[in-house]
Amino acid sequence: MVTQTIVTSPFNDQRPGTSGLRKKVTVFQQDHYLENFVQSTFDALTDVNGKTLVVGGDGRFHNEHAVQVILKMAAANGFSRAIVGQNGLLSTPAASCVIRKYQAFGGIILSASHNPAGPSGDFGIKYNIANGGPAPEAITEAIFANTQTISNYKIVDDGDISLDVIGSQTLGDMTVEIIDPVEDYAELMAEIFDFEAIRSLLSDDSFDIRFDAMHAITGPYGKEILENILGAKAGTVINGTPLTDFGNGHPDPNLTYAKELVDEMFSDQAPTLGAASDGDGDRNMILGANFFVTPSDSLAVMAANAQCVPAYKSGLSGIARSMPTSQAPDRVAEKLGIECHETPTGWKFFGNLLDANRATLCGEESFGTGSNHIREKDGLWAVLYWLNILAVRKQTVAEIVEQHWQEYGRNYYTRHDYEAIPSDIAKQLMTDLEAHFPSLVGQSLAGKRVSYADNFSYTDPVDKSISKQQGLRLGFEDGSRIILRLSGTGT
């Protein structure tokens, strides 16, 4: 093995966002661009010699090339073992599961999540730490600092790994283990949920489920778990083959982009349960027949019905939600007498709460839900959670949610997404608006009196770290809110 040291120079645009570094594929295809970020990541970590690294991605265009580069750089930087999903594939939840199960030092996940893929689409990379969760801000800031001073990177001069062959291979002094990307995750799901009850539900001819994988990573996971293990009808999983361009679609599971599923769920022949996941498998949308469940209501209903699921039947330690998520989960936490934490958007902010057992279930406004079973949000886990609730309660989705509203009240909101706006214009709008905030407190807007106006700041109750400028908030005396924030996941 020959380790090469390649001279390079910094790129000024490599600051990680809410969930890693996301740019157009053409940006990542620049000479040294990916390598600079990977080396800057390794340099931000403590001694990696002899450690294990998990590597995988959502299968979008540029994924396999990036996996090969990362493996060669990991070998050059001293890792002794790499665990890689077959064909370079791992959903983000599965990657978190694998990191935790095999006690890896960390992992590199290749995904731009719900963003479009293909040669003209987006690509992304992020580092997850040993607990399986996204790197906290202290590490991402160190990575960014390194990208601004990098002068060289290390890579082994060796051939490519055969990513399609399960088993062990050698790359320099590093062992590369190619694993089934679904197996470990499926085993974890079987430990959490009552698979027998769900299997019985799915065998009932009156019950039908449709799962839209949107030509992204969750297709193989859905087919194996829903159809092969739990016995759902063949064809339950639609758009189930991962494509490098996601079928030229936008794999964001919402009412706009999951149109095929939504049209079926609001038809006369609607299945009992409809669900969709996104590019890397960490988001979910839940639908009943002619009924849409908002992300915040989904989290609230899941928390209120935790006793239906074996892994959570002994109770929840707490609930955590992102600041823009509606306050529906707060009502459940109050009734259960447990903590409810409000964090900035970004799953990395839930990690400390989960590790410290201050929260069991977490959710955010962009169709993300998860729990302490891993340290990422988890789309298919949420679908199985709803199936478990339906199997126990033997009611429809609409009946369960409407009964929830009767008990806890209903939180209404509307969300408006403004996409592909030039970032400088969006930032200036936010700056100008915030400048007016001091004069708004005490005023009435549309008949509602403003009680506070601020830029959300979060103090982590576990490590006391402070995250500022996490979104503009206008709060009213009746408890209603107006929230504005810049996306940290767009390109």
Please annotate each region the language model reported:
Residues 24, 52-58, 126-128, 208-212, ...:
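Short glycine-rich or small-residue beta-strand-to-loop segments that form or flank ligand, phosphate
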Residues 271-273, 277, 286-289, 310-491:
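Phosphate-binding and adjacent anionic-ligand microenvironments
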Residues 54-121, 224-286:
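N-terminal small/polar loop signature for handling phosphorylated ligands or for N-terminal nucleophile
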Residues 2-11, 32, 121-269:
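Gly/Ser/Thr-enriched, mixed-charge loops and adjacent short helices
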